[in-house]
Amino acid sequence: MKINKKTVIALFMIVMFLFTILISIGDVLEVLLRGNKRGTIEEVEETIVVIETTMGNIEVKLNAVSAPETTANFLDYVKSDFYVDTVFHRVIPGFMIQGGGFIATGKPKITEDPIELESNNGLKNLRGTIAMARTSDPNSATSQFFINLVDNEFLDYTSTNEGYAVFGEVVEGMEVMEAIGNVKTATSGLFEDWPEKNVVILGAYLKEN
């Protein structure tokens, strides 16, 4: 049987079309099997993390809907016990308390790769909210977080300000947050606002329902 040029082209187009469909199906299956590297929204939605400190417990409700990557990143550190024996190394009354990156000696802990900034998520740096700390590079947040002691509007995202990504709020332990925020601080090495008596994070874990 003679196969003309048009038939060959038509068959080629059909084969390429089927090949494209197979690749698309393969990509979808890969995503479903692999999952999200930093967790999924279903895993972290409505999650409460207990931050156990030497001054009491702080319970934080995470907002995975508004800040999915930031929340999943935080949970990765929680689940790996990364925060155990870290301290609140920066305490500024009337501003915020910051921790999650250093141990009591001032030695930094080795972190995972930084994440992209999710500050443009509609959440504000209000009193009692938790947000990711970072350097001047917007996409540099790793493990360090801070809790706002007051409404800090200047930390919010605007068209001219990258801001800081809020990903949850304190639901229990506001008095502990306030107590930590009122401890005496001093300069310790490179740190200007280090508590005179270390406020240690004994553990951070998921609250059981």
Description of each model-found segment:
Residues 1-209:
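Cyclophilin-like peptidyl-prolyl cis-trans isomerases
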